Amino acid sequence: MKSKENKYDKAYLKMAREWGNLSYCERRKVGALIVKDRMIISDGYNGTPTGMENICEDEENYTKWYVLHAEANAIMKVASSTQSCSGATLYVTLSPCKDCSKLIYQAGIVRVVYICLLYTSDAADESCRV
């Protein structure tokens, strides 16, 4: 069972990485997928809010304050649909920050799988790293 789960984890992480390539952010491209019962119910990548110019960094190459993280974008898509994150798995290319970890918990996501550890938090400790 574990090897089959690991096989799917790797496949979904590859897809999350490809999704992250859609980001307009220059410094870091992050992608996220929310999967429930082996079905992708949402996706997201880091970027500016809808209707804003797709420039994520300022003149000094710092990320602008209003840029949304991939996890937040994916969770917000589910919130505006008929789906629910309850019991789902989040696949993301970068470990969630503390604010996203709170959103993940509140959304009912029970498992987080990520590629790279950037942020450390109690929520990240509960994650499965592939």
Language model region names:
Residues S42-G44:
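Short hydrophobic alpha-helix segments
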Residues T93-Q106:
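Local cysteine-cluster metal-coordination motifs and their immediate loop/turn environment
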Residues V30-R38:
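Short beta-strand scaffold segments in enzyme catalytic cores
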Residues Y119-A124:
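Conserved small/polar residues in nucleotide/adenosyl-binding loops
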Residues E5-R28:
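Short, basic/aromatic recognition patches
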Residues V110-R111:
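Short acidic/polar active-site loop segments enriched in Thr and Asp
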Residues E71-L94:
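Mobile, glycine- and charge-enriched loop segments
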Residues N46-Y66:
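A short, polar/charged loop-to-alpha-helix boundary motif
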